[in-house]
Structures are given as C-alpha cells and as structure tokens.
Amino acid sequence: MSLGDSDRERVVAALGRDPTPAEAALFENLWSEHCAYRSSRSLLSAFDSDSEAVVVGPGDDAAVVRVPGTDQLVTVGVESHNHPSYVDPYDGAATGVGGIVRDTLSMGAYPIALADALYFGDFDDEHARYLLDGVVEGISDYGNAIGVPTVAGATQFHDGYTGNPLVNVACVGLVTEDRLVTAAAKSPGNKLVLVGNATGRDGLGGASFASEDLAEDAETADRPAVQVGDPYTEKLLIEANETLLDRDLVVAARDLGAAGLGGASSEMVAQGELGARITLDAVHQREPEMNAMEILLAESQERMCYEVAPADVDAVREVATRYDLGCSVIGEVTTGNYVCEFDGETVVDAPATVLADGAPATDQPSTVPQAPATDRPDPALGTAIDAVLSAPNTASNEWVYRQYDHEVGARTVQRPGEDAAGLALHEADDGTTVALSAGANPGWTACQPYAGAYATAVENATNLAAAGAEPLAAVDCLNGGNPEDPDVYGGFEAMVAGLADGCRAIDTPVVGGNVSLYNDSATGPIAPTPTLAVVGYRDQHPVPGSGLAGDGDLVLVGGHADGLGGSVYLQALGGTDQFPAADAAGVDAVREAATRADTLAVHDISDGGLAVTLAEMVTADAGATVTVPGLAALFSECPGRAVVETRDADALQAALDVPVVRLGSATTDGTLSVTVDDETVTRDAATIRDHRGVIARELD
C-alpha cells in the first residue's frame, strides 16, 4: 500500500512529520475514492435530503425516516459490493448483505427486509451466468440464514457489465425513537468495545481495491481483498445488538466495513469531534502475529464497534458471552487525536477529522453526453412481440427470488413479482404497510444518462404507486466507471443530475447512499447505473395485484409514449432512438387509480413497455384484448404510467388529471390479443410463460 505523492504531501503537512507505515495505510484507505467520494462529493449536493419525515439524513450508516401516523421509524440504507462479487461472486455478494444489515444494526434498528439490484454482462455469456449463479446463491444463503427476507429488487443484463458486475443491496429496518443510535461518539472517557467475530487478515485493503479498475487477473490476484462471511455469527450479532439496546448499554455504534477497525473507530470519534486512544493488541484475533496495519485495516466480517459507558462494560461483555461472540475493550474516547498503540509503541497519532474528512476533492474533466439519432426498426408485430417477450431483461425473475426466503419474519404481504414489496407494520396496529422498490435500468442511462436517471426515480415511485403506497425517502447507489475518463465522468455527472431532478419531481428526499466508481475493466466501463431504493408507506386500504381479473375494461393511465431509446425492443431488434421524457405527474394518478374500489388490477409500465406489462398481467384464467396505435406505443418504456383494469373506465377518466387511454378489455380466455394498425397477434398464457422463462430454462 502506498499514498500518492500529492496525498502524502498533505498528510505530512497535517501531521508535521512523515507518516508511519500504519498511518500511511490508514490514510490511503480512508482517503480512497471508495471511502472519501473524492470525485463525486461535489455532485452530491444536488440532492434534496430534507422532509418532515426525515429523522437522520445522509452521513450515518443508514438513514432514518418516520412513518406517518405511527410511532415507528424506518431505517434504509444501500451499499455496493461490486469488485468483490467479480472476484468471488458467492462471498462477495454474501458479505454485501452482511454489511448493509450491520449498517441497520448501527442505528439501533432491527432488519426486516432486503432488496437486491444485480447487473451482469450479456446473458448469453457463460461467465455472466456463472457470476449470476454465485451472486444469487451468496445472497440467498446469507439472507436466509440470518432470517431477513429478500423481498424486492431487479436483475439486468448489459454488455457493459461483462468484466465488472454490480451487486447493490438495500436493507430496511425498524426502530423507535427511544432506541435510535447514531455513529457519533458522545463522551470522553467512554470505552470503545469491539463485539463479534475475531479479526483475521481477510479483506485487507478492500477499500483501496474498490477504488481501482479491475485487472484482467483480478479473480486470482485480488482474492485476499474479498471478505468471507459467516451468517450464523451475523444472526447472533443481530440478537446481541437487540439485547444491548434493550438494556440501554449502547451510546454510539458503527459496524466494521470498509477500512475495518481503523475506518469505523476513526469515523465514530470524528463525527463527535473527539479523539480516541486504542490498544490494537487488545483486539481479539483469529490469526497469529498480525501487525498493526493488518489489525487496523482487515475487513473481517460480523464485527461492531460500540461506545459504552465505563460502568456498563461488564454488562456488554456478559451479553457478548451469552451469544458466543468475541468481545474486546480496545480503547476509549478522548478529546485529543486518534491514537493507536501496538506492542508498546504509538503507530497512529493523527487528528480524527483529518483521517475521516480530510481527503481533498478531485476535479475531473468531463464531456457532455450526446443524444442518439433516431433509427427505428420496422419488424412484423409478431416478430417484435416474441423477441421482446423472450429477452432476458423482460424475463421472469422467479428463478432468482424463489431462492430467497421472502416470507421469513411474517411481514411480507406483497411478494416478489409484484410492482413493489409490501411489509406489514404490525407495531402500528392499524394496517399500515411499508413498501419497497429498488433497481435501475442500465439501458436507459446508457442511452441518455440524464433522462434515464430521471426516469429511474419516476419508475421506482410508480412501482410504489401501483401498490397504493406513497414514497417517504430514497437512497441511491451511484455506480460509474473510471472517473478519470472524461466521457465516463460526463455520463456520471449527467446521471447524478438526472436522478436528483427526478427525485425532486416525485417529492422524495434522498437521505443517503453510496458511490461506487472505477467499475471498469479490460472490456470497458459499465453504463452509468443509478440504483435507487425507495421506501414508502400505505395505510390500511387494500389494493389489487397485477394479475387480471378478466372482468373489466383496460385503460392506460398516463397515456401513450413514443420514444424507444433504451428499450428492450431496440436491444432485441437493433436501432437507436432518444429516451422518452418521463412525467412524474403520472405517479399520483397511478396511486389514485390503484386505491379505487372499482380497480381490479394495476401494473406499471417498465422493461419491455406496454407489451410486457400486458403479458405479465395475463393468467391462465384471464386475458386481454387491446388495440395500440403503433409499435412505439407498444414498446416504449417511459415510466410514470400503468395499465389498470377497472369496472368503471368513465369514472376513472373523470377522476384523474393525466391522460387515460382506453386500450380494450379483459377477457376470461387466458390469451393476449394485440392489434396494431391492421395486424393482430395472439399469444396464450402458456406461450407467454415459456417466452419469459429463459433465465430459469437456461440455469436450472
């Protein structure tokens, strides 16, 4: 490990001397792109992060928002584990789950749900399938073992991820105000206590590793930078954390993630504008002869750092012992520098704020992305429908989510496969449901980063609206390639601006998130990928699902769209086009339609456009007969719109302030019949299911 020349000069100026080897390694990791957001920090001010519901916004391990009408607080956070999941898809993905769950614990919350947004290279690529298989197994094994359901997410395939997949995981938790904890250290003299797994050498330099392009030999050369998870210890840590909170033993908390103990402990005291004195020899270790740098920076999993009052240390140790967890009193909070001692010598002595917040921002050159030309194909209607329904990006994700236990915890009331997940808030005792949507479409942002990111916000809000829910807050995972490339950084800038404007348009604060850059490899950079996780709520009003009842008229709330840019239609059949302008006004209209008593089914427009939305609504017992004005109207993926089956189309049209277009009617024959101009194509439910079963068919 080594600091760059300019950073080393800054460190020498701050310390008044050359750094020790341990200090240099600590600064390199904490000042890395992964930890310090050096290339993106200046862009993040574009996001609005305040609302009446926000209790804790950006800067902590997870954000906290209040659920209106209840005494419950919801925590939400999102993290990336991209590079590790390429090197070791199973452990990389599993430890990504573990890390975001511990972020939830750090706030005093109990984790109730996970969502995963996964991005891989072309589905036809054998290595992409290998990565998909390993990532899903890792998430499944870890999430199932700790008893937290994975209830929402998305899986996307795009050639930009061939050499660098993305694994973005969000977690939602519950807490009440009296149990809320933050990471900021509070009082000099309090003890710092490390609870959980013993520290080994795994994950060394993980933060630095995540701040570089993936090399061609990364799967072997970078294996030591990938952590190894133990979900059974994580489950014990979850329950121990609850017990510590029950007994009011926690003053502040932070999980050990990027940069390990050095990152967690220095950030805790920096947030409290305090210092610390830490004895590294006191850390419980599982490997012999570890040196100071290894103890400081190892990213061994399932560990928490707590600030504890001196009088409560024995009680904390007793709780750890009860749950068969290691426990070390490693130091105390001070008013001075952040100091670490090892083998009787001082190996780190630096201001905590310089370590945690002193990395200078990097000004990156950028070029403005250019809009694509319009060059649309003109296939036969049947050819187009079959091609789009058979595409991996419109395929059923059942193969993925059936591996997850989405029922554990007895809260799940809207399951994977619907527009958004729904989780019963039993504590509110009034039927309130927490809703969750997560994901992004790289085809949209590869086409036009600003418009595609804006649409990502509208799409996730529409998912909630189709479930009758109103958004409370969002967290983002901003994934990009090498920021030193002006074209890449220009796309990243446009993506951030578009997502910020889109979240403003849906009136949803962005309360936290994660930036992951240097997602670049020998095959090139990824598409700018703005994963968004939106948490919302719904009162006791029931809403229908997406399956047709076969007993109503079909209308399109939000009207037809024309642009085909970023669509599966163009991916499957060739051509280019501009991305359609999403209208956030449709979100409220979809929500109103979903909660009406005369609504029988509702499903939003997304991947594959109107054609796929209708196909997904068809069941063996209910079908649809519709007329659409053209191929663009059938396949445009412009969000903020939904198909609604209603008993009273006239009343619905009169009630909404957005265009409502009559499409046709639901039937009881289990077939989809689509007419465009003078051409009609019919596909039955079995054929649709076969088309959309490509992932399961190829991987089972």
From Swiss-Prot:
PANTHER family: PHOSPHORIBOSYLFORMYLGLYCINAMIDINE SYNTHASE SUBUNIT PURL. The gene is purL. It is an enzyme of class 6 (ligase). Monomer. Part of the FGAM synthase complex composed of 1 PurL, 1 PurQ and 2 PurS subunits. Part of the phosphoribosylformylglycinamidine synthase complex involved in the purines biosynthetic pathway. Catalyzes the ATP-dependent conversion of formylglycinamide ribonucleotide (FGAR) and glutamine to yield formylglycinamidine ribonucleotide (FGAM) and glutamate. The FGAM synthase complex is composed of three subunits. PurQ produces an ammonia molecule by converting glutamine to glutamate. PurL transfers the ammonia molecule to FGAR to form FGAM in an ATP-dependent manner. The keyword Methyltransferase does not apply. This is Phosphoribosylformylglycinamidine synthase subunit PurL. InterPro entries: PRibForGlyAmidine_synth_PurL (IPR010074), PurL_linker (IPR041609), PurM-like_C_dom (IPR010918), PurM-like_C_sf (IPR036676), PurM-like_N (IPR016188), PurM-like_N_sf (IPR036921). Transmembrane segments: none annotated. It comes from Halobacterium salinarum (strain ATCC 700922 / JCM 11081 / NRC-1). ATP binds at residues 37, 476, 513. It is found in: Cytoplasm. Substrate binds at residues 80-83, 102, 227, 299-301, 516. NCBIfam families: FGAM_synth_II, PRK01213.1. Its EC number is 6.3.5.3. Mg(2+) 1 binds at residues 79, 514. GO terms for cellular component: cytoplasm. Mg(2+) 2 binds at residues 103, 255.
